[in-house]
Amino acid sequence: GAVYNGGRIENVAGNFIGNQSGQDGGTFYNAGTVGSIGGNFLGNHVSRYGGAVYNDDRDQIDNISGNFVGNYAGSGGAIFNRGNIGGISGDFIGNYVSGGTFAYGGAVYNDGNSQTVSRVIDHIRGDFIGNYVAGGYNVAGGAVFNYNNAFIGSITGNFLNNYSRAAGAGNVALGGAVYTAKKMTFAAGEQKTYFMSGNYT
């Protein structure tokens, strides 16, 4: 990808367009601590996790802001989190995960891969539009996938036309907009209401 952090970075700002990695984190792979990442993330991709941003096991990003458009990966089309993220703000449009036996988290994958250590995203503020997962057998979370010992404090925004689709009869597709294994709060914010419309499996 474009940036690898194994120490501490205070702030990263800019637009990230068409970056790629053979494994994880098309624009940013974090294995340390980051104050903030800001900018637009357009058409970045990886073969495994986090088309735009990958946050590694137990590592910290205080804030991510910007729009995520057309990013794709093996899981977590835009963001894949295995650590802690304070907040994410921005719209997620047309991000996706496609192909393979399993496909999870068209826009955001929050992975609690440990049963003893929590992985947390404090809040997400933004709209999720036209994100999807499509795979061969087991797919879930067209926009957001929240799994195992992972927590997302709240999501404020609209979910429009996201989907989860598995190929073939008898295969499993869950959560056209959101799949979560934990309790999650959906908030309206200043607009006083939010919409979930056109999402499907």
Go through each PLM region and give its residues.
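Surface-exposed loop/turn motifs in large extracellular/passenger domains
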Residues: 1-24, 28-49, 53-72, 79-104, ...
